[in-house]
C-alpha cells in the first residue's frame, strides 16, 4: 500500500516537472538555430535580466536550460535527455534527485549550476573525493567557459600544497566550483580563523549540489570536521588501564549493549578496579581521570573492532566509515578514544590535541542559501532528508528500462559453507566469460578472496578504497569479458562500469555481494553497479547466520542453535522454512541497524545544536571585529565598564591591595599605586577609578602607534585574540562534555538536556571571559615593528 502511495506521489511530482520540460523543449528547438556567438551572448543577457529584476531564476529556467543543453552538444558532444532535464529541475528546486547509476548525473548538474551561477553569487558541485571532483571539473570546464562563466577546482591537487596569500580567495571568486565536502568544510573553519579581513576568502554559500548526497549528509552526518590545536595534557594511563580491562569478564565485571554502543562497569568491576589501582572510591573526584580512562579502554576493547571500525595501516589507526566502508585517513576519534584504541593495538600512543574549530556536515550544508543532491538511493532515506533538511526525493525515470535481474538471497548455515558455494558459483560464471564483481564488507575479506582466486589461477583486480584514481580506472574495466574484480563496497564508487564487446550477449556484469550491508541503501547501490543504461546484468547477495549483520544486530537465538549444525547442510539449504527464517533474521537485523543509525544521527544533531548556535554567534562577533575600520573613534568605555563591574561584584571585599593587583594584572604595568582618593567601600567609585586608568592606558597605547591605520590593526588583533583563545577553550570543553555525556548509560533525554544546560552556562562564562580578555589585551598588549616595517603584536 505504502509503495503504491509513494509511486502515486512521485508521479504527481513528475507531472508538474514535465510541464517545465515541455517549455525547455520548445526553447531547445528555438536555440538550435542560434549561431555560436548568439548562443554565447545569452549568458550576458540572462545576467542583465536577473540584475534588472526582469526575470528570476525560476522564470528564466526553461530558456537557460535550453541554452546550456545546446551548448553541451556543441562543446561536449552530449545532449541532455529529457530524464536529465527532469533531474536538473529537481536540483534547481532544492530537492533530492534519485537517478540510477549511468543516467548521467554529471551532465545533469551542469544545467542548475549554470542557471544559479547567473546570479553572480557562486555555485558549488560537492562530491565525496578529490578524484571525482577533479574528473568532473575537467570534463565540464570547457562547457562553462564557452558559455562565458568561470569555473575552478576548489583546491590545488598537490599533496601538502601551501596556498599563497590570496590564492584561495581567487578560487572562490569563480562562478562555479567543483570541490569535496571535506575540503569545503575545512575551508569554512579556516576562513573563520582569519585574523584580518584580507585573510578571509570564503563568500556567502549560495547554491550547492551534493553528489552522493545520502553518503555525505546522512551516513557521514555524525562525523565532525575538526581543526586541532595545542596538545592536551597527556594521560599516561592508556596502556596500564588496557592491561586491567583485559582481566575483566563480560556480565561479571561489565555489561554492554553493542547495538547502542554502550558499555559500563558492574559492581564487581568497580570493586576489581578499586583493588587493582588501590583506590578507595572509584567515583571520587580524585579518581575521575582513572574512571574516564577505564571507560575509554572498555569502549576501545569491545565496541570498536579492527578491520570493521578501523585499520591498522602503516603504523597508524585509520578509521572506517561503517556504513560505506570508506577509509577516513587523517580523521581521529576525540576525547582520548583514539589513543585508547592505539593502546589496545599495542601501539605508541599519539598526542591527543585540543579542538580549535569543528562543524558537522549537517550544519555545514545548512549554511547554504539553497542546496540539492543527487543519488541512486535517495528514496530509502526520504523521511530523514525531510526531517533534517526539509528535502523531498523525486525518483527520476531511467532513459531505458532496467534489465538487471536481482536474484533472491542465497542462504547458508555458516560462513564457511557460504564461501564454498559462492566461490563455486563465481568460478562457473567466470568460465562462461561473464565479468564478475565480488563485493565484500571489509578489506580483509576482499584480500582473502582475491588471494583464493589467484591460487585458483584466476587473475583478478583487488580494490579496497585506498587509491581512488587507480581504482576508478580498474572499476571502469570491470565490465570487460572474462574480468574478475574483488572490491569493498566503496571502492571505485562514482565510476560507471561499461560493458565490453560481447559481454551483453553473455548476460552482462554479474555482481556478487558477500553479505548484506548495515544499510539497505548501500545494498541497492551495490546492486546498481550492474545494469546501467538498460544493460543486462544480475546481482545476488549471499547470507549466513555467521554474517556480521546477524551477529551484531540480531536478537534471534537461531544463530546460536547448535541443533542446526548437526543437520545435513544440503537438507538444511533445501528447507524453505529455514531459508525464510534466516532471511527474516537478516532483514530484521538490517532494520535494527538502520534504526540505530537514524537514532545516532538524531542524537548527533541534538548535541550539535548548542555548539552550532554558539559557533554562529562567535563567528558573527569575529566578523564585526574584522570590519572595524575606525578604531580611533570607537569608545570602548562601555566594554570596560562591564568588565570592571564584574570585577567589583565578584570580590567579596574590595581592598587597596586587591585593586592595585587587578590594575597591574589587567590594565597597566606602570601604575603608580596612587589610590588615596578611592573609597573602596563604594563599588561604583572603584569602577569609576578603574575607567580612568583604562582611558589613560588606551590613550598611551594610541600615542605609541605610528598611525591610525596601525592602531586599527592593533585593536582588531587584540580583540580577535581574546575571542579566539576563549572560543578554543569553549569548543574543546564542549567536545569533552559531549564525550562524557555519551558515556552515560541511561536517561538519554536528561543527558542531552543536561548537556545543553551546561553548554549554555559555559557559553555565558566564555562571553564574560572574552570581555575581560579584550580589556586586558587592549591595555597590556604591545606593538613593535620588524625590519620590513610590519607590525608585530605582543600579547600579555
UniProtKB/Swiss-Prot annotation:
Q: What is its EC number?
A: 7.4.2.8
Statement: the UniProt record of this protein carries the keyword Cell membrane = yes
The primary location reported for this protein is: membrane
Which reactions appear under catalytic activity for this entry? Answer: ATP + H2O + cellular proteinSide 1 = ADP + phosphate + cellular proteinSide 2
Q: Which Gene3D superfamilies match?
A: Helical scaffold and wing domains of SecA, P-loop containing nucleotide triphosphate hydrolases, SecA, preprotein cross-linking domain
Q: One Pfam match, by short name?
A: SecA_PP_bind
- Assigned keywords, A-Z: ATP-binding, Cell membrane, Cytoplasm, Membrane, Nucleotide-binding, Protein transport, Translocase, Translocation, Transport
Can you tell me which residues bind ATP? 84, 102-106, 496
Keyword set includes Protein transport: yes
Its record classes its membrane topology as: Peripheral membrane protein
Molecular functions per Gene Ontology? ATP binding; protein-exporting ATPase activity
Q: List the disulfide bonds.
A: none
Superkingdom of this protein's organism:
Bacteria
GO cellular component terms listed in the entry, alphabetical order: cell envelope Sec protein transport complex; cytosol; plasma membrane
Question: How is this protein organized at the quaternary level?
Answer: Monomer and homodimer. Part of the essential Sec protein translocation apparatus which comprises SecA, SecYEG and auxiliary proteins SecDF. Other proteins may also be involved.
In which family does this protein belong, per the annotation? Belongs to the SecA family.
* Chain's role: Part of the Sec protein translocase complex. Interacts with the SecYEG preprotein conducting channel. Has a central role in coupling the hydrolysis of ATP to the transfer of proteins into and across the cell membrane, serving as an ATP-driven molecular motor driving the stepwise translocation of polypeptide chains across the membrane.
| Entries under HAMAP family matching the protein | SecA (MF_01382)
List the protein's name.
Protein translocase subunit SecA 2
Q: What is the lineage of its organism?
A: Bacteria, Bacillati, Bacillota, Bacilli, Bacillales
Amino acid at each position: 500500500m505504502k509503495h503504491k502511495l509513494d509511486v502515486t506521489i512521485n508521479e504527481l511530482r513528475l507531472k508538474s516537472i514535465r510541464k517545465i520540460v515541455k517549455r525547455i523543449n520548445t526553447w531547445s528547438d528555438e536555440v538550435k538555430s542560434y549561431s555560436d556567438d548568439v548562443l554565447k551572448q545569452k549568458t550576458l543577457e540572462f545576467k542583465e535580466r536577473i540584475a534588472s529584476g526582469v526575470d528570476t531564476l525560476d522564470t528564466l529556467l526553461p530558456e537557460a536550460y535550453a541554452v546550456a543543453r545546446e551548448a553541451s552538444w556543441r562543446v561536449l558532444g552530449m545532449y541532455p535527455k529529457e530524464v536529465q532535464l527532469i533531474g536538473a529541475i529537481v536540483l534547481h528546486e532544492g530537492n533530492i534527485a534519485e537517478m540510477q547509476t549511468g543516467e548521467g548525473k554529471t551532465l545533469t548538474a551542469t544545467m542548475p549550476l549554470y542557471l544559479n551561477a547567473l546570479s553572480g553569487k557562486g555555485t558549488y558541485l560537492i562530491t565525496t573525493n578529490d578524484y571525482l571532483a577533479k574528473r568532473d571539473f575537467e570534463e565540464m570546464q570547457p562547457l562553462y567557459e564557452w558559455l562565458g562563466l568561470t569555473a575552478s577546482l576548489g583546491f590545488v591537487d598537490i599533496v601538502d600544497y601551501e596556498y599563497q596569500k590570496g590564492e584561495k580567495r581567487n578560487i572562490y571568486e569563480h562562478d562555479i566550483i567543483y570541490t569535496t565536502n571535506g575540503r569545503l568544510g575545512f575551508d569554512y573553519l579556516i576562513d573563520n580563523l582569519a585574523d584580518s579581513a584580507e585573510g578571509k576568502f570564503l563568500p556567502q554559500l549560495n547554491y550547492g549540489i551534493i553528489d552522493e548526497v545520502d553518503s555525505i549528509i546522512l551516513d557521514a552526518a555524525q562525523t565532525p570536521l575538526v581543526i586541532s590545536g595545542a596538545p592536551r595534557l597527556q594521560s599516561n594511563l592508556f596502556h596500564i588501564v588496557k592491561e586491567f580491562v583485559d582481566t575483566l569478564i563480560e556480565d561479571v565485571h561489565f555489561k554492554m549493549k553493542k547495538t547502542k554502543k554502550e558499555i559500563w562497569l558492574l559492581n564487581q568491576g568497580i570493586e576489581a578496579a578499586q583493588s587493582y589501582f588501590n583506590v578507595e572510591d572509584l567515583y571520587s573526584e580524585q579518581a575521575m581521570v582513572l574512571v574516564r580512562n577505564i571507560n575509554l579502554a572498555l569502549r576501545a576493547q569491545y565496541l570498536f573492532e579492527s578491520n570493521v571500525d578501523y585499520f591498522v595501516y602503516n603504523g597508524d589507526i585509520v578509521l572506517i566509515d561503517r556504513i560505506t566502508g570508506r577509509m577516513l585517513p587523517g580523521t581521529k576519534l576525540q576525547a582520548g578514544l583514539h589513543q585508547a584504541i592505539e593502546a589496545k593495538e599495542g601501539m605508541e600512543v599519539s598526542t591527543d590535541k585540543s579542538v580549535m574549530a569543528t562543524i558537522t556536515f549537517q550544519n555545514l550544508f545548512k549554511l547554504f542559501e539553497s542546496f540539492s543532491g543527487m543519488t541512486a538511493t535517495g528514496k530509502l532515506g526520504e523521511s530523514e532528508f525531510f526531517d533534517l533538511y526539509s528535502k523531498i526525493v523525486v525518483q527520476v525515470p531511467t532513459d531505458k528500462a532496467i534489465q538487471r535481474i536481482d536474484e533472491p538471497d542465497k542462504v547458508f548455515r555458516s560462513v564457511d559453507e557460504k564461501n564454498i558455494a559462492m566461490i563455486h558459483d563465481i568460478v562457473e560464471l567466470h568460465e562462461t566469460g561473464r565479468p564478475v564483481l565480488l563485493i565484500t564488507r571489509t578489506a580483509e575479506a576482499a584480500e582473502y578472496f582475491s588471494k583464493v582466486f589467484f591460487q585458483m589461477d584466476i587473475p583478478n583486480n583487488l580494490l579496497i578504497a585506498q587509491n581512488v584514481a587507480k581504482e576508478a580506472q580498474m572499476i571502469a574495466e570491470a565490465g570487460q569479458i572474462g574480468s574478475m574484480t574483488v572490491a569493498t563496497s566503496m571502492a571505485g564508487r562514482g565510476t560507471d562500469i561499461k560493458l565490453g564487446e560481447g559481454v551483453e550477449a553473455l548476460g552482462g556484469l554479474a555482481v556478487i555481494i558477500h553479505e548484506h550491508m548495515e544499510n539497505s541503501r548501500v545494498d541497492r547501490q551495490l546492486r546498481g553497479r550492474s545494469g546501467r543504461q538498460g544493460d543486462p546484468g544480475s546481482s545476488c547477495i549471499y547470507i549466513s547466520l555467521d554474517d556480521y549483520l546477524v551477529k551484531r544486530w540480531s536478537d534471534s537465538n537461531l544463530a546460536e542453535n547448535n541443533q542446526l549444525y548437526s543437520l545435513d547442510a544440503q537438507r538444511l539449504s533445501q528447507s524453505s522454512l529455514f531459508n525464510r527464517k534466516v532471511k527474516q533474521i537478516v532483514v530484521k537485523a538490517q532494520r535494527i541497524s538502520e534504526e540505530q543509525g537514524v537514532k545516532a544521527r538524531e542524537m548527533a544533531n541534538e548535541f550539535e545544536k548548542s555548539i552550532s548556535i554558539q559557533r554562529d554567534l562567535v563567528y558573527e562577533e569575529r566578523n564585526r571585529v574584522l570590519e572595524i575600520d575606525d578604531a580611533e573613534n570607537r569608545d570602548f568605555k562601555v566594554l570596560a565598564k562591564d568588565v570592571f563591574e564584574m570585577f567589583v561584584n565578584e570580590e567579596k571585599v574590595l581592598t587597596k591591595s586587591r585593586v592595585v593587583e587587578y590594575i597591574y594584572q589587567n590594565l597597566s604595568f606602570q601604575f603608580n599605586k596612587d589610590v588615596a582618593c578611592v573609597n573602596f567601600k563604594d563599588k561604583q567609585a572603584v569602577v569609576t577609578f578603574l575607567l580612568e586608568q583604562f582611558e589613560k592606558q588606551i590613550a598611551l597605547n594610541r600615542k605609541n602607534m605610528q598611525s591610525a591605520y596601525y592602531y586599527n590593526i592593533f585593536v582588531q588583533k587584540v580583540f580577535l585574540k581574546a575571542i579566539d583563545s576563549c572560543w578554543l577553550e569553549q569548543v574543546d570543553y564542549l567536545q569533552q562534555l559531549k564525550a562524557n555525556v555519551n558515556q552515560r548509560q541511561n536517561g538519554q533525554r536528561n543527558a542531552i538536556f543536561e548537556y545543553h544546560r551546561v553548554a549554555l552556562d559555559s557559553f555565558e562564562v566564555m562571553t564574560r571571559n572574552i570581555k575581560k580578555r579584550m580589556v586586558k589585551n587592549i591595555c597590556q598588549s604591545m606593538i613593535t615593528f620588524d625590519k620590513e616595517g610590519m607590525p608585530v603584536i605582543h600579547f600579555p
